[in-house]
Amino acid sequence: MTREQLYSGKAKTIYKTDDPDTLITEFRNSLTAFNGEKKGEMEKKGYYNAQISKKIFEMLEAEGIKTHFVEMLSDIDMLVKKVEIIKIEVIVRNIAAGSITKRYPIKEGTVFKTPVLVFDFKNDEYGDPMLNDDIALALGLATQEELATLRELALKINELLVPHLDKKGILLPDFKLEFGRRNGEIILADEISCDTCRFWDKKTGQSMDKDVFRFDKGDISKAYEEVARRIVPEIFE
């Protein structure tokens, strides 16, 4: 399969293929935090994130959630369906952590009675600001019906992920989702990995995600490897 680079993001590179209906996502070893202000590299990061995403996409597909995942072409190359990305990041919060504890009088570790769902404008230039429905509509990012669909899908994904990860000794304080339009439908895109989720060890509360790099909490490689061992143990056999 031929490939031509379409664009390169903070941690993934996207390629065109000879099939206009598919793209290749290459998961790189790049680490970034604070909108690219802090940078680093980690051996096998791309591998772990790609394999974690694959496994979670497959689980969600089995539960009726449509995703852009097609197949793995290599350890780090994922063949995906081409979608029109919706420029809205959908954040689902189950336990208070990160920015919400700085913006509001909520203590870190507070368990929300119901998930807190937030929309952010996917735009680095403006620092990914929070959106409400009116602003999203004014910017032409989505229709009212699409916003409702984003909420419905995100909450359904959360309902599936929380117990799935809990069985593996992982808490899911919050995570970011991205969606795209394809053939009149909205489907899950991007990735679900240590880069896009907060993963805490169920017993210790220890971070096992990009916060380890972001806030110098310890060995980032060990954190990502531990999550991979729990979610995709077969890659270590």
Swiss-Prot record:
InterPro entries: SAICAR_synt/ADE2_N, SAICAR_synt_PurC, SAICAR_synth, SAICAR_synthetase, SAICAR_synthetase_CS. One of its GO terms (molecular function) is ATP binding. Keywords: ATP-binding, Ligase, Nucleotide-binding, Purine biosynthesis. Gene3D superfamilies: ATP-grasp fold, B domain, Phosphorylase Kinase, domain 1. One of its GO terms (biological process) is 'de novo' IMP biosynthetic process. Pathway: Purine metabolism; IMP biosynthesis via de novo pathway; 5-amino-1-(5-phospho-D-ribosyl)imidazole-4-carboxamide from 5-amino-1-(5-phospho-D-ribosyl)imidazole-4-carboxylate: step 1/2. It catalyses: 5-amino-1-(5-phospho-D-ribosyl)imidazole-4-carboxylate + L-aspartate + ATP = (2S)-2-[5-amino-1-(5-phospho-beta-D-ribosyl)imidazole-4-carboxamido]succinate + ADP + phosphate + 2 H(+). Its EC number is 6.3.2.6. PROSITE patterns: SAICAR_SYNTHETASE_1, SAICAR_SYNTHETASE_2. Belongs to the SAICAR synthetase family. HAMAP family: SAICAR_synth (MF_00137). This is Phosphoribosylaminoimidazole-succinocarboxamide synthase. It comes from Methanosarcina barkeri (strain Fusaro / DSM 804).
